[in-house]
Amino acid sequence: MDKGRCTILNSEELWAQARQLFAGGVNSPVRAAVKPFPFYVERGKGAYIYTVEGNKFIDYVLGYGPLILGHSPESVKRKIIEQLEKGWLFGTPSKLEIELAKKISSHIPSAQKIRFVNSGTEATMAAIRLARGYSKRSKILKFSGNYHGAHDYTLVEAGSAATEYNVTTSDGIPMEIMKTIEICEFNDLDCVDKKLRNEDIAAALLEPIMGNAGVILPEKGFLSGLRELTKSYNSLLIFDEVITGFRIDIGGAQSYYQIYPDITTLGKIIGGGFPIGAVAGKAEIIDNFTPAGRVFNAGTFNANPISMIAGIATIEELEKEYPYNIANKASKTLVEELERLLKIKHTINHIGSMFQVFFGIDKVRNYSDAKRANKEYYIKFHERLLKERVFIPPSQYETIFTSAAHEDDVVNDTIDKLAKVIGELS
């Protein structure tokens, strides 16, 4: 930290105040994983974030995924400012929600109709209710280590901060609810077949690429096999593309793998860094939402103009393709350099502009594997990188992201810092 600028003191003072005001000092648990206390960020631009003390970090967290264009891109900021001048909440429909829905539907193959909500959590919660209402079945099949937000129907064997803090199955969830959730390991079709065979599963819900236990990829045949099995047993297939939507491909993981679900949940990127979620899918299914059907969903801030315009502006940039070229190149280069530099046992799971490194293990294909990785070594890796002003997720069970702002100079600077840190840890 920069001496003379009270770096630790400033953040420490804020942390002391936060602990008096918030449970655990934070409003989302993974933020407390930075030790000995979080640094407080004042602003972000491009690939960088700046703390309240003025310290500059290269950012590979990117708000945990939404900021595929980097921080505060001018094209998005300009549109948001224009909308702020007009107003930001009306309690009525706006043409912006139609524009964003059209953009999403034009790129996400299965998105015939859409219901906007306010977060990924709300999206999966609504999608589960929708699947149950449509199918007239009560059970949901989910996969160990998949994280679908902080609500009762998915906080069973959950990844992300739920794993970091050892509350993969949260207190406060009635046993009656837990009995409606069936669990399989990711990449295990035999388990899926057994669970679906009773024909009481409303839907299989999963991240097509796991991003909340580190990055874990579907093995060849897993997604296609899952699609076939759900059809055979008359269960719906829900892809949670809150992370992968508009990141892996402009059409999401479903476009990349050419496997199309009945329902898709979206968030993060489609709001350009503002709160958003969406449930998309076949028209005959989405039309079960009120007021067209009897599956209730509502929200004061659903389709609010600011999130809509930020999403439109972001997707307009993504349609130019350059963001994917830059972000994917940055990720690929960093992974190649990590493979060259690391001499200890490890594996790196990588796709597009997202990756994660697992130490002490040579293969990670599911949640059980991810939990066997050397978490303590990862924490040391994270802490040493922080000293070099590089910010990667403080938890092993998150994803390292790159963006269109991670140009060659940023990546080269990062590689120099990686070499130093890995040398010190060797």
UniProtKB/Swiss-Prot annotation:
Subcellular compartments: Cytoplasm
Entries under SUPFAM superfamilies matching the protein: PLP-dependent transferases
Statement: the UniProt record of this protein carries the keyword GTP-binding: no
Known cofactor(s): pyridoxal 5'-phosphate
Gene3D superfamilies: Aspartate Aminotransferase, domain 1, Type I PLP-dependent aspartate aminotransferase-like (Major domain)
Pathway: Porphyrin-containing compound metabolism; protoporphyrin-IX biosynthesis; 5-aminolevulinate from L-glutamyl-tRNA(Glu): step 2/2
Protein name: Glutamate-1-semialdehyde 2,1-aminomutase
